[in-house]
């Protein structure tokens, strides 16, 4: 193989590897989003100091003194 052919092959391999890595980084973002959703406190659950309420909910105190994550009013 001559120099031009080697250069083209190297360019194609680099493009393929770059595409694979880009796909993996998107996958990592999805997995991290899933992980964040798992560790948040869902609606109608007691508020926890270690885990914030999930998006769309907020911590509200009840008459019994316990705070619960409740859905936000629109």
Curated annotation (Swiss-Prot):
The presence of a 'disulfide through disulfide knot' structurally defines this protein as a knottin. The record marks 39, 66 as: Important for the neurotoxic activity. Keywords: Calcium-activated potassium channel impairing toxin, Cleavage on pair of basic residues, Disulfide bond, Ion channel impairing toxin, Knottin, Neurotoxin, Potassium channel impairing toxin, Secreted, Signal, Toxin. The record marks 46, 50-51, 68 as: Critical for the neurotoxic activity. It comes from Hadronyche versuta. This is Lambda-hexatoxin-Hv1d. InterPro entries: Toxin_16 (IPR012499). One of its GO terms (molecular function) is toxin activity. The keyword Manganese does not apply. GO terms for cellular component: extracellular region. Belongs to the neurotoxin 11 (kappa toxin) family. It comes from the Eukaryota. Residues 23-35 form a propeptide. It is found in: Secreted. Expressed by the venom gland. Disulfide bonds join 40-54, 47-59, 50-51, 53-69. Transmembrane segments: none annotated. This excitatory toxin inhibits insect calcium-activated potassium (KCa) channels (Slo-type). Pfam families: Toxin_16. Residues 1-22 form the signal peptide.
